[in-house]
Amino acid sequence: MLNEFIAIRRELHQIPETGYKELKTQAYLLDYISKLPSEHLEVKKWRTGILVLVKGTNPEKTIGYRTDIDALPITEETGLPFASKHPGNMHACGHDLHMSIALGVLTHFASKPAKDNLLFVFQPAEEGPGGAKPIMESAEFAEWRPDSIYGLHIAPEYKVGEIAIKPGLLFANTSELFISFKGKGGHAAYPHLANDMVVAASAFVGQMQTIISRNIDPMDSAVITIGRIHGGEIQNVIAETAYLDGTIRTLSPETMEIVWTRLKQLAKGWEEAYQCEVEFHPGSDYYQVDNDPVETEAFIHFLEEQYPESYVPARSAMTGEDFGYFLSEIKGFMFWLGVDSEYSLHHAKLSPKEEAIPFAIDVLIHFLESK
């Protein structure tokens, strides 16, 4: 018999929606939650997200658990019988698993409340433009603000049954990068009468990598990746405009500031050298996921006692996650949940092993009961 929460995952997988458009997802979650025992539950909507408070039997504090609910603008290529029914959208980062796990834990505590209050945060827009910071600033969250908060993220590189975590920095600071170049277009045969923005932008791609190699401490780490470049409209016309879209990843806020300062300095030089206008356009910025050492060590001890084969020491990763905003103000941690997939996060063929769902539910129930 198919596990109930694996079945839920498959239903959620078919209705992927991007940030702040998670209307079907929200409706699905609300419908499920409405069927749970309601004696100890309070439910609030926040935009396309949901907050659920499970009132404790003798509460002295509130413990938070957060899951993200949005999907990515990726065309699915898994070939699964329960593949996305929303063309161009896919749960390619495991948020369908995240939600089903959260529902599994919530279902348990709705029937068997813990001593303390539990707050379940179903957060929209993790993939962009970022939902963690605005939901934290909301009146709805403020009323039920937890004293600690936890979360997980699937990890294709770990086996089912493995949990990877470390105290301190787990995920990097991330900043989306959108740059436009505006020059002077013209006929392809007369480059001397134009300012070619394809040339300017492509040269900028290479030059910005010197920031990493020459401006960042070799004992530190940072990444600038350009994932999309667009310039011009037709093959025999010199491009008047060009655009670079990418991301910056650093292991500290200070290093992020260095990268941005140098990018802007380079841009000023580019304007002079290529006789163009260079403009940076706003994108999402995500704060590092910095696990509280005391909370994390307590969880590691819990795993070693209760799930001795599961704990794997993690390394810091350049992955970005806006859960970092929660941890910047509230003690807690995030961990990697192994799902053993040959394809990476954000890949059109990502197919996590679903056995990770009941395993994670079991771990989280026992951990939260121990708090």
Swiss-Prot record:
**What top-tier enzyme class does this entry carry?**
hydrolase
Q: What does the entry give for GO biological process?
A: diaminopimelate biosynthetic process; lysine biosynthetic process via diaminopimelate
Query: What GO terms are given for molecular function?
Result: N-acetyldiaminopimelate deacetylase activity
Q: Where is the active site?
A: 68, 127
Which Pfam families does UniProt cross-reference here?
A: M20_dimer (PF07687), Peptidase_M20 (PF01546)
Enzyme Commission code = 3.5.1.47
Alphabetized InterPro entries for the sequence: AcetylDAP_deacetylase, Amidohydrolase, Bact_exopeptidase_dim_dom, Peptidase_M20, Peptidase_M20_dimer
Pathway stated in the Swiss-Prot or TrEMBL entry: Amino-acid biosynthesis; L-lysine biosynthesis via DAP pathway; LL-2,6-diaminopimelate from (S)-tetrahydrodipicolinate (acetylase route): step 3/3
Q: Which domain of life is it from?
A: Bacteria
**Residue ranges the record marks as coiled coil:** none
- Entry keywords, A to Z: Amino-acid biosynthesis, Diaminopimelate biosynthesis, Hydrolase, Lysine biosynthesis
From the UniProt record, list the reaction(s) this protein catalyses: N-acetyl-(2S,6S)-2,6-diaminopimelate + H2O = (2S,6S)-2,6-diaminopimelate + acetate
What does the UniProt function comment say about this protein? Catalyzes the conversion of N-acetyl-diaminopimelate to diaminopimelate and acetate.
Q: Indicate the family of this protein.
A: Belongs to the peptidase M20A family. N-acetyldiaminopimelate deacetylase subfamily.
Q: Which NCBIfam families match?
A: amidohydrolases
What HAMAP family does the annotation carry?
Answer: DapEL (MF_01692)
Its name, as the record gives it, is N-acetyldiaminopimelate deacetylase
**From which source organism is this entry?**
Listeria monocytogenes serotype 4b (strain CLIP80459)
